Design a protein with these regions (language model features):
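Structural motif
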Residues: 36-37, 57-59, 77-79, 96-100, ...
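RNA substrate-binding interface of SAM-dependent RNA methyltransferases
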Residues: 3-6, 10, 51, 84, ...
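Short, glycine- and charge-enriched coil/turn segments that flank and shape catalytic ligand pockets
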Residues: 53, 64-77, 108-118
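Glycine-rich nucleotide phosphate-binding loop and flanking beta-alpha elements
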Residues: 46-47, 67, 87, 106-108
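Glycine/small-residue-rich loop that forms an oxyanion/phosphate-binding "nest" at active or ligand-binding sites
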Residues: 69, 73-103
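Solvent-exposed alpha-helices and their adjacent loops that cap or buttress functional pockets
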Residues: 30-32, 91-93, 113-116
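Boundary-proximal intrinsically disordered activation/regulatory segments immediately upstream
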Residues: 1-67
Length: 120
């Protein structure tokens, strides 16, 4: 995670880093409940979060992904990781370079109403 002093976080290159275990736990309902976070994998889901204005807890991304998608970087903490570490965190076979952690909605919150498509 980015440091509070404004300096970027160090690249995580070890699969034994505690963050790897924390993120992998989010693949299970218990981990999501305990940490209060949702795991979103991929650029498309991050784009949707940005489009909807959803607040993110943090981004975890490879250096290459950051270079290719600078406009998707926001004000939330950014944790750079090696491609091997991202692969260890992800549930997909071929992650595209980014994982977003989103605060889990509080119980009882109503989902936003989506516009209904009109029948032809």
């Amino acid at each position: 995670m980015s440091r509070f002093d404004g300096r970027p976080a160090d690249l995580i290159s070890s699969r034994r880093n505690p963050l790897v275990h924390q993120v992998r736990a989010l693949q299970q309902p218990r981990g999501r409940r305990e940490q209060g976070l949702l795991l979103l994998e991929g650029t498309h889901l991050l784009q949707e979060c940005r489009r909807l204005g959803l607040p993110l807890d943090r981004l975890i991304a490879t250096t290459r992904w950051q270079e290719q998608h600078p406009t998707l970087l926001g004000s939330e903490p950014l944790q750079p990781v090696s491609p091997e570490v991202l692969q260890a965190m992800a549930s997909t076979d071929s992650p595209d370079g980014v994982i977003s952690l989103l605060p889990h909605p509080a119980p009882g919150l109503q989902a936003p109403s989506w516009p209904q498509a009109k029948a032809p």
